Regions:
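Long, contiguous binding/interaction regions
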Residues: 2-91, 99-198
Length: 198
């Protein structure tokens, strides 16, 4: 059983719940490895999951499976939620997770990290920083705290895309006052992300 891979995700390209159950058993380890490859930790508490057709298709199919959704309207709602996170060839899109297992610490840190999503950046070797465009779908913070989940997009110009495809190094960073951090992306992660770019 194979899943149809398309440039976008449509209702017609999704598997039925029964077909997905079989597909999932055979392919979950490979999908989890792909997700891990495209996940970049920044410090102890930030994790950026760079999305792809594979990660988003998996997320949609999992939501449909868990919620036992098979009606057209419910399927369309999941598509409307996740398809905008597909990279378009000129950008990288991701889900930023602020991970604090302790409830009290999470509450405290989310209040200290208001605006963190706008301070996330990537820096392609030899090029200026590109800051994230965050939460285009809705407001995810208020005056008291930020959300533990943000959706971010990094737009890369043609020179940056060419540099990444040619093997340039890339840093992921954050220059929020209360969470300054940066890391160099692993070559295997960059190889996967380079495949998103045209």
């Amino acid at each position: 059983m194979t899943m149809t891979i398309t440039p976008t995700i449509t209702r017609e390209s999704l598997l039925s719940l029964e077909a997905y159950s079989k597909y999932r058993k055979e392919n979950k380890p490979a999908i989890m490895a792909h997700r891990k490859l495209r996940s970049v930790r920044l410090g102890e508490n930030l994790n950026l999951q760079f999305e792809s057709e594979t990660t988003l298709r998996y997320q949609i199919q999992e939501m449909l499976r868990i919620e036992k959704v098979f009606e057209e309207e419910g399927i369309q709602q999941e598509l409307d939620a996740y398809v905008p996170l597909l990279p378009t060839g000129h950008n990288w899109k991701g889900t930023l997770l602020l991970e604090y297992p302790d409830v009290n610490e999470r509450k405290r840190e989310l209040s200290r990290l208001i605006g963190i999503e706008d301070r996330m950046f990537i820096e392609v070797e030899g090029h200026a920083r590109v800051y994230a465009i965050a939460d285009e779908d809705l407001e995810r913070e208020n005056d008291e705290k930020t959300s533990a989940v943000h959706f971010v997009r990094f737009e890369l110009n043609a020179a940056m895309r060419a540099a990444v495809k040619a093997g340039a190094g890339v840093k992921l960073g954050c220059d929020h006052t209360n969470y300054p951090a940066h890391t160099s992306m692993a070559p295997e992660t960059l190889a996967s992300l380079a495949g998103d770019l045209i």
